[in-house]
Amino acid sequence: MIFRFGFVSNAMSLWDASPAKTLTFARYSKLSKTERKEALLTVTKANLRNTMRTLHYIIGHGIPLYRFSSSIVPLATHPDVMWDFVTPFQKEFREIGELVKTHQLRTSFHPNQFTLFTSPKESVTKNAVTDMAYHYRMLEAMGIADRSVINIHIGGAYGNKDTATAQFHQNIKQLPQEIKERMTLENDDKTYTTEETLQVCEQEDVPFVFDFHHFYANPDDHADLNVALPRMIKTWERIGLQPKVHLSSPKSEQAIRSHADYVDANFLLPLLERFRQWGTNIDFMIEAKQKDKALLRLMDELSSIRGVKRIGGGALQWKS
């Protein structure tokens, strides 16, 4: 049984390598027309360059999973900007995709919490569709739309979770089918539990990303993992990818929802051990604040366990 690991967006070990450098609309608005275009191009070029740097870093370290930054392109979905970001950077996007395919990396996006489909407001749903389309367009430009996913949360409850869930099923119809086919859903730490998210995933035929930290932090989440996890595994069969789990540990007992800098191996071990009974290869995305540093430290700690063999910078053969 193989466990593979990855991290989110920015390699902390690299100098000045953020792939999420920003250009605010306030700053953009103060520029001339020529300066505006130049600023958009400059920031996007820097973010694409740092994405490439990060990919080379994870390839060199044998890390097989990576989550792209959602902020590669500044103001891509702002209604007063919404510019063509693909044409000027066709070469860069294509090179990123070739790296991903050549080294068989598993990649994903995770739009922010405002990209949701439970709102009764049409404008919120319209913005969600626009944001999902932006992420999908980047995957298309990279040539990896058929092998990556875009992960979101179900959304808010708006005072009535049953009504909001029904709203989700209605609103998601506005999402183009090719984008929905690459969408995944994740349980959250306050509102939608493991069971509730699983039910939506099963009804919509969408893969379920299980977040162990959210399960732990959500006071209403009482799922029997011996029942829920096999169902989670099954939701991934349609797209042919290994099941995916998000990992982090609480910052403290007082701040259980906050992500710690590193991952507490003892916090995760019960979950990792639980997967042994199904013998399924699992992919894990590390969401700790120290990102790649947290991943590499966790690999050192887990590989020291009797019966566990490290087979890559971010891969373990788990004990049978």
From Swiss-Prot:
It holds the Pfam family UvdE. GO terms for biological process: nucleotide-excision repair; pyrimidine dimer repair; response to UV. The keyword rRNA-binding does not apply. It is an enzyme of class 3 (hydrolase). Its EC number is 3.-.-.-. One of its GO terms (molecular function) is endonuclease activity. Keywords: DNA damage, DNA excision, DNA repair, Endonuclease, Hydrolase, Nuclease. NCBIfam families: uvde. Component in a DNA repair pathway. Removal of UV LIGHT damaged nucleotides. Recognizes pyrimidine dimers and cleave a phosphodiester bond immediately 5' to the lesion. Belongs to the uve1/UvsE family. PANTHER family: UV-DAMAGE ENDONUCLEASE. This is UV DNA damage endonuclease. It comes from Bacillus subtilis (strain 168). The lineage of its organism: Bacteria, Bacillati, Bacillota, Bacilli, Bacillales.
